[in-house]
Amino acid sequence: MTVHEFGKDNKNVVVLIHPALVMWDYFEYVIPLLQEKYRVIVPALPGYDEDKPGDFTSVEEIAAELARWLAAHGIKEIGGIYGCSMGGAIVTRFLADQRIRVRAAVIDGGITPYQLPWIATRCIAVRDFLMIYMGKLGGIKLLEKAFATDDYSEEDLQYVAKVLCFVSAKTVWRTFESCNNYKMPMDFQSGCKTIEYWYAQAEKKARKLDIAYIRNHFPQAVFKAFENVGHGGLAALKPELLVAELERVMGGKEER
């Protein structure tokens, strides 16, 4: 897994983990706002790295690989970690593993494991796979039907179409299968005392089960809804707000 670093001379470490169907440059507007003050670490997740062909592995493996990379580079503590959607799933598992000390974490619309019968989870994975893979085959017109148009502009969908041109069918399948069904350690207690779960107000109903899961497994978590933004929209549409809120969380300040 390739890891991109910015602001290497800074001591306070911030890790950013991107969602599915995008590349690490999802944070292109966020990185410049952080790199003057923080050592910013952005992994290019397997299967979504245009410069390093391969397949997505799993939420568990990526969380473990990230922890190994950080330890190998002498990083025992990070000031903040942010993950969106699929990236939020990886943050959730990373926090549960407790291999690296985390002072503050933000799970933005993060996906939590389904608490459903096995056959139901397979049916959901097949549905999601077909929706996205048909978009890969059919291009932007089918993607427009697959995604809510109020959340994604045509430019956004063109970017997704570009990513889908190089990702494999195995990556698409593993993404949904793993994000929906990744395993968590038994009876874990995260040592991270400052955790926030963010979501768009418009997706509150869709995130209901994820919110309940986080509340149950991370009782210290605080929940924050954002108006006038869709799922995963902060990094691209409101990077200044994302950075301001992330710094608030890292500073231990209460929700505004």
Question: How would you label these PLM feature ranges?
Answer:
Residues 191, 197-199:
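Short beta-strand/loop motif that positions the catalytic acidic residue
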Residues 96-97, 102-132:
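Flexible "cap/lid" loop of the alpha/beta hydrolase fold
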